[in-house]
């Protein structure tokens, strides 16, 4: 039996030792598949699954969300999932995993699909029918199903053969016969797409073409995905016959042509269909046109916008996915408020003259970044109507307030007994995703009294569901919510239009209808780049220029997922970009232009301009690979400096400015940032079970000069070795462990290597591995050219030939000091040759070059350029240069005795005494990290023994620091000990940290924080504690330390920290920097104190510590966090803390008493549902739906955690346990009743409907079935397993009104049992002791006279009677109008 102290213990749960507070449910679990964060989490799981080979489980979770939980929209997830197209994946490619997503039945393996799962084509039929405003005909169904069936069969064969190959160890482990079988399947699939795609849009009927276009869009996506796999994986599958270099070139041509063809086809068919709607004459035809636009946008255009990303030449495979944000907006939903012809949109006039940014359909609708919804003010009225003297509610007007203005829709009467106005405040961080409507119907003119044949209607109440599942009520009275208007998945309500009710009666000028503007949730997010995931991968990001901060003119564009920005001659535009991780990015623009146009491009990093030059935006009219849109042909253009295609961008907010310096318009779609990723040598599995070495990579003409190895051995694998070879000679050997061990190694390879192989061993050497390099490969024949890279060692020889005012880059790589360049040249004329050294695209050194030359660059540089400056007339130079990277020869270690002396002094200063068993009082954890960096820099050759001894002492200091630290994992060595936001990650390899650090990214759609609580039992009474840490970079970082009420709460601005050059006696951090507004930044090291008085083990306040980002573009990198004992409190300090603690305890006890009074009755009632009060056990046999519905969950004051806004508080956890217990009881009741969906939680599923039976929502939140009159009924035929004619059953019914339940049974002779229910209020009635003459029983619910509301019905086996019970047809009833479990959702 559940008791109070179990659910609401006197000692709250231990944050570290117990299960942490769970995340709040996504909005999708509350109402609609709305919350983008749910999709993002499932996408992360799929990405991990593809690389780990467990993708079928990840897809099964998606299918469960679609078909069981109803929290995911199929179409939306697939569209978002296509962002994985650029991932570096194993040799199976990306098409194979997606087969199980497109066709649920093919997601086999160890994770079969849900029983009711459909393929994506079947799942989108309801939307297609809604778009064409009719049901698909039998012929249309046969046509569509037949085509898709043929594709599914081909996909199944492809999948099966790929599985067979992988089960044998991969393509290099199987014979040519199996490879041929697979390539035949590949080519068959390719032929199917080529041959059958056109049939979906070539029918001679307009409807057939329109209904086929969503199919066409999905199939085109599948085809492009297959072609991309052929291009990127084909040489691995079959490089000798079907996928030779020439064949791959042919497929590259195919994918480019198909991208253009598929995009144009979708756009042309969409435009043709749009034109067929003409100019709408009323709101009904207007709404149909907008519904067409909505379905075509989400099912077709949103897919077509992604087609160019399938081209591997344009979007090559990298370490991360690709995210192209959408900003296009949709008019949806349409809500009738007051009409003359029932509550429909029919014959209702449309007036858009008062709609901002509508522009007769050619506008962009209100920009959600400029017009942010603040409040709705509704003006209702209740007055005696002209029909029957009834009080009728009307919505006179609605006032929409945004950040720009307040606009009134409708008009206020001069005199009227108004009720209101009613206010709805809108939180932009928790936007509206659904609108519910309560209606009031009135009888037609001349009728007497109430009549269900309704001809007039108005809205009596509105409520708005927010993304987190909470509901905002607009009041106005009213009864049940009978209509739900959900926005498209992952959208929110960014604006609300109104149109007047224009008639000749007294109600003219009222609001006739409301029209929502649905906006993608990412549209208002900051433009964030450089955000790593858990594996450290950084995505390619694309931001519509529609998100610009100034400039340009918005023009309608259908195909890009965003409207275009027209940049006319002389106009400028600027877009802010926030970078989380400093590094190199390729910047690209997607645009359209009818003429060659010069655009001045300025990347302003606030102190530097890495790009500040005029760029030619060439005419795109005749571009063969561009995509046609409404404003021209769109192409992608790289924005490069004169010497580098990548741009160094610091970790901060920068601004990109473009100015049209030409004479023609340029239409800007988006700006893209592609992170520089390390060259990938190999990614996939290795296996030597055949007995031969596994050659991962080899080349006849290219060498790499360094290597990064990362992987994990299989559990059955033994240890082995990796060989790096150069022309057959083993250059380096790297150990590869076995038995599930992970491994990581990185080495320079000065000699260069052109082959990587895993040595064979018995019984097996196998696992997964990623092999990369820090730098691109170099020609092994020492060929020259423009560009090059950091070859290291003696690699990197360049031939150069310059004339006139020419230049060439001979090195581009990591930032280094001491790069060595030598060579010679011949010349004509009188040349001056200059060697320019660059750092972050800025010249840091210019050195004259004479032949022969031998130059060492003394400054830090990441790029070298040879520049020819003719002194007198024309000149030429021809020569050779060899660049040697310092990563081989450059030695930064400390070798002088004074260095050893300085570092030894600093090591000893870490300790309080010579015994080294206690740290000095003022030493922080970060102090230890700075010292270890210096110890590690001591020369092994000169001070080997001393270095070893000093490192031992520093290790001891680190152990002592961890022992005194009350936080677990203060340097994130135990990441699981922290609560963290969904996108918060740990990162290594920072110049200021020896340990890992945490990256708190910009919040986005979910908060960005870390949090930990130190339990009371760990503290000492009357003691001061120090809370400290090191911030390498912090923008809008809030530091909170709380015991009795957030004693420390401070937002800091810490500029990006850059290490000083490492010296033996100087600090590691940091040159002084100012914040973005020019003020001096906060210090990198923070330290606060918090006082603990008497311990309170019962209340357990402890010390709570958290860091979080409080602004959308904030970010932070933090480590070395500590809470440690400082000193005992003085007498006056004890008195002060006692006073604070006493006040806190008073409020604490008051709140607990209030909560206890609310939850104890609920605990008692839930205990009554279960045998022995065991909430995890079985419910009692006499429990009915009404017993569950009668339990009303309380409203507790604090459901969210006080710091972590996306997690439950202790009270929220209690509510979740209550709801879980009710859900389990309900599920058991569902299993015990013979009727399916007897509670009507799934609308009228499993029931056959006659007449106008439909589901409605009552004012208290209950969903019930409404039978409006005697012509309405629902029925269900059940089949009883293990039928026994002597078995007795009980019928339990809960409803309101006058109706009957009939049970028809018998085979040769029909028997009908009738149960009558006549109650004015919601009442439970029962019929006991029923027996049946056959195993098939038809149950029918009918209305007898007027409205009959059905809450639930159950038919259950009767328990065995006791001696004093009589089961002969007993009936009973009880009245109860309490709310159901559904009102607490």
Curated annotation (Swiss-Prot):
Record field: compositional bias (Gly residues): 782-796
Ranges of Low complexity composition bias in the record: 1370-1385
Region described as Disordered: 768-799, 1359-1385
Disulphide linkage map: none
Keyword annotations: Sporulation, Toxin, Virulence
GO molecular function: toxin activity
UniProt cross-references to Pfam families, sorted A to Z: Cry1Ac_D5 (PF17997), Endotoxin_C (PF03944), Endotoxin_N (PF03945)
GO annotation, biological process: sporulation resulting in formation of a cellular spore; symbiont-mediated killing of host cell
Gene3D superfamilies found in the cross-reference section: Galactose-binding domain-like (2.60.120.260), Pesticidal crystal protein, N-terminal domain (1.20.190.10)
Family assignment from sequence similarity: Belongs to the delta endotoxin family.
Primary role: Endotoxin with nematicidal activity.
Name under which the protein is recorded: Pesticidal crystal protein Cry5Aa
């Amino acid at each position: 039996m559940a008791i109070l102290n179990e659910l609401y213990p006197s000692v709250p749960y231990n944050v570290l030792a117990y299960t942490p507070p769970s995340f709040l449910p996504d909005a999708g679990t509350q109402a609609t598949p709305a919350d983008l964060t749910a999709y993002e989490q499932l996408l992360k799981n799929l990405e991990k699954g593809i690389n780990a080979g467990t993708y079928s489980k990840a897809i099964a979770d998606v299918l469960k969300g679609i078909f069981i939980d109803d929290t995911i929209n199929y179409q939306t997830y697939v569209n978002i999932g296509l962002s994985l197209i650029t991932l570096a994946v194993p040799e199976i490619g990306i098409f194979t995993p997606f087969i199980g997503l497109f066709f649920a039945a093919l997601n086999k393996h160890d994770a079969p699909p849900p029983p009711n799962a459909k393929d994506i084509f079947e799942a989108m039929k309801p939307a297609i029918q809604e778009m064409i405003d009719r049901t698909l005909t039998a012929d249309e169904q046969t046509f569509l199903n037949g085509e898709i069936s043929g594709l599914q069969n081909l996909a199944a064969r492809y999948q099966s053969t790929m599985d067979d190959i992988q089960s044998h160890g991969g393509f290099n482990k199987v014979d040519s016969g199996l490879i041929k079988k697979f390539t035949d399947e590949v080519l068959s699939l390719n032929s199917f797409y080529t041959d059958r795609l056109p049939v979906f849009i070539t029918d001679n009927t307009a409807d057939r073409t329109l209904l086929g276009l969503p199919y066409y869009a999905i199939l085109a996506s599948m085809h492009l995905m297959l072609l991309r796999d052929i291009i990127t994986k084909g040489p691995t599958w079959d490089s000798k016959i079907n996928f030779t270099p020439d064949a791959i070139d042919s497929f590259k041509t195919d994918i480019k042509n198909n991208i253009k063809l598929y995009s144009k086809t979708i756009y042309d068919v969409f435009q043709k269909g749009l034109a067929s709607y003409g100019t709408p004459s009323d709101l009904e035809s207007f709404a149909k046109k907008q519904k067409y636009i909505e379905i075509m946008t989400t099912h077709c255009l949103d897919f077509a916008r992604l087609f160019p990303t399938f081209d591997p030449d344009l979007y090559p495979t990298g370490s991360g996915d690709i995210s192209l944000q959408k900003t296009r907006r949709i008019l949806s939903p349409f809500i009738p408020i007051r009409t003359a012809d029932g509550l429909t949109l029919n014959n209702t006039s449309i007036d858009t003259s008062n709609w901002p940014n509508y522009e007769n359909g050619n506008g962009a609708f209100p920009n959600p970044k400029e017009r942010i919804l603040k409040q709705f003010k509704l003006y209702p009225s209740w007055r005696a109507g002209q029909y029957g003297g009834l009080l009728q509610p009307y919505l006179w007007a609605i006032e929409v307030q945004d950040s720009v203005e307040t606009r009134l829709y409708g008009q206020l009467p001069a005199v009227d007994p108004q009720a209101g106005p009613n206010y709805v405040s809108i939180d932009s961080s928790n936007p509206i995703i659904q609108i519910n409507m309560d209606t009031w119907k009135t009888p037609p003119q001349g009728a007497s009294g109430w009549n269900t044949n309704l001809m007039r209607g108005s809205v009596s109440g509105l409520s708005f569901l927010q993304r987190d599942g909470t509901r905002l009520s607009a009041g106005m009275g009213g009864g049940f919510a009978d209509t739900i208007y959900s926005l498209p998945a992952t959208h929110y309500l960014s604006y609300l239009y109104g149109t007047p009710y224009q008639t000749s009666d007294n109600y003219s000028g009222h609001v006739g209808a409301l029209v929502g503007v649905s906006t993608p949730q990412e549209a208002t997010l900051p433009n964030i780049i450089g955000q790593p995931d858990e594996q450290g991968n950084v995505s390619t990001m694309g931001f519509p220029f529609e998100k610009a901060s100034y400039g340009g003119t918005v023009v309608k564009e259908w195909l890009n997922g965003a409207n275009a920005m027209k940049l006319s001659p002389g106009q400028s535009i600027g877009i802010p970009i926030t970078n989380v991780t400093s590094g190199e990015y390729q910047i690209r623009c997607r645009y359209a232009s009818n003429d060659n146009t010069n655009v001045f491009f300025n990347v302003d990093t606030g102190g530097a301009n890495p790009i500040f030059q005029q760029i030619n935006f060439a005419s795109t009219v005749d571009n063969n690979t561009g995509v046609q849109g409404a404003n021209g042909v769109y192409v992608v253009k790289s924005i490069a400096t004169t010497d580098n295609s990548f741009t160094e961008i610091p970790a901060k907010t920068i601004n990109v400015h473009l100015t049209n310096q030409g004479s023609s318009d340029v239409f800007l779609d988006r700006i893209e940032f592609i992170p520089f990723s390390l060259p990938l040598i190999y990614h996939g599995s290795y296996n030597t079970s055949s007995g031969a070495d596994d050659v991962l990579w080899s080349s006849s003409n290219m060498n790499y000069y360094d290597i990064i190895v990362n992987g994990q051995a299989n559990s059955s694998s033994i240890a082995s070795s990796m060989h790096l070879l150069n022309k057959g000679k083993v250059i380096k050997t790297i150990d590869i462990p076995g038995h599930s061990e992970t491994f990581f190694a990185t080495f320079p390879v000065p000699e260069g290597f052109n082959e990587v192989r895993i040595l064979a061993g018995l019984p097996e050497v196998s696992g997964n591995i990623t092999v990369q390099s820090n730098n691109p490969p170099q020609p092994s024949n020492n060929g020259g050219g423009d560009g090059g890279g950091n070859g290291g060692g003696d690699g990197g020889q360049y031939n150069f030939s310059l004339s006139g005012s020419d230049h060439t880059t001979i090195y581009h790589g990591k930032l280094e000091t001491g790069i060595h360049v030598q060579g010679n040249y011949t010349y004509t004329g009188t040349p001056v040759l200059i060697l320019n050294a660059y750092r972050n695209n800025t010249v840091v050194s210019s050195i004259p070059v004479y032949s022969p030359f031998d130059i060492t660059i003394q400054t830090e540089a990441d790029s070298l350029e040879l520049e020819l400056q003719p002194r007198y007339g024309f000149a030429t130079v021809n020569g050779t240069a060899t660049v040697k990277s310092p990563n081989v020869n450059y030695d930064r270690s400390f070798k002088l005795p004074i260095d050893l002396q300085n570092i030894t002094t600093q090591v000893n200063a870490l300790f309080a005494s010579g015994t080294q068993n206690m740290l000095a009082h003022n030493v922080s954890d970060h102090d230890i990290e700075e010292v270890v960096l210096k110890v590690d820099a001591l020369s092994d050759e000169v001070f080997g023994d001393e270095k070893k001894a000093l490192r031992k002492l520093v290790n001891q200091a680190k152990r002592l620091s961890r022992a005194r630290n009350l936080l677990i994992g203060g340097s994130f060595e135990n990441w699981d000990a922290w609560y963290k936001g969904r996108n918060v990650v740990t990162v290594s390899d920072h110049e200021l940290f020896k340990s890992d650090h945490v990256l708190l990214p910009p919040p986005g759609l979910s908060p960005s924080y870390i949090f930990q609580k130190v339990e009371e039992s760990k503290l000492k009474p009357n003691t001061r504690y120090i809370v400290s840490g090191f911030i390498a970079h912090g923008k809008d970082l809030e530091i909170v330390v709380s015991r009795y009420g957030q004693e420390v709460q401070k937002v800091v601005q810490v500029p990006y920290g850059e290490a000083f050059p490492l010296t033996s006696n100087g600090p590691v951090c940091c040159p002084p920097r100012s914040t973005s507004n020019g003020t001096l930044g906060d210090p990198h090291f923070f330290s606060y104190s918090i006082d603990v008085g008497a311990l309170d083990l019962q209340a357990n306040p402890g010390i709570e510590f958290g860091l979080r980002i409080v602004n959308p573009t904030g970010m932070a990198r933090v480590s070395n966090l500590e809470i440690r004992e400082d000193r005992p409190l003085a007498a006056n300090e004890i008195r002060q803390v006692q006073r604070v603690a006493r006040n806190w305890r008073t409020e604490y006890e008051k709140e607990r008493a209030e909560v206890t009074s609310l939850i104890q009755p609920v605990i008692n009632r839930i205990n009554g549902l279960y045998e022995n009060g065991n909430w995890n056990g079985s419910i009692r046999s006499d429990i009915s739906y009404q017993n569950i519905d009668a339990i009303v969950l309380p409203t507790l004051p604090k459901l969210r955690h006080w710091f972590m806004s996306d997690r439950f508080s202790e009270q929220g956890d209690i509510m979740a346990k209550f709801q879980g217990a009710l859900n389990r009881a309900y599920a058991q009741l569902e299993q015990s009743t013979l009727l399916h969906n007897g509670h009507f939680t799934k609308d009228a599923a499993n029931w056959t409907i006659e007449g106008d039976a439909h589901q409605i929502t009552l004012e208290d939140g209950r969903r019930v079935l409404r039978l409006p009159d005697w012509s309405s009924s629902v029925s269900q035929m059940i089949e009883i397993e293990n039928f026994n004619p002597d078995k007795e059953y009980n019928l339990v019914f809960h409803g309101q009104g006058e109706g009957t339940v009939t049970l028809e049974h018998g085979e040769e002779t029909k028997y009908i049992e009738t149960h009558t229910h006549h109650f004015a209020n919601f009442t439970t009635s029962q019929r006991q002791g029923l027996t049946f003459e056959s195993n098939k029983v038809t149950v029918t619910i009918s209305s007898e006279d007027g409205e009959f509301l059905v809450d639930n019905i159950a038919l259950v086996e009767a328990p065995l009677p006791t001696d004093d019970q009589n089961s002969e047809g007993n009936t009973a009833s009880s009245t109860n109008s309490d709310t159901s479990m559904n009102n607490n959702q």
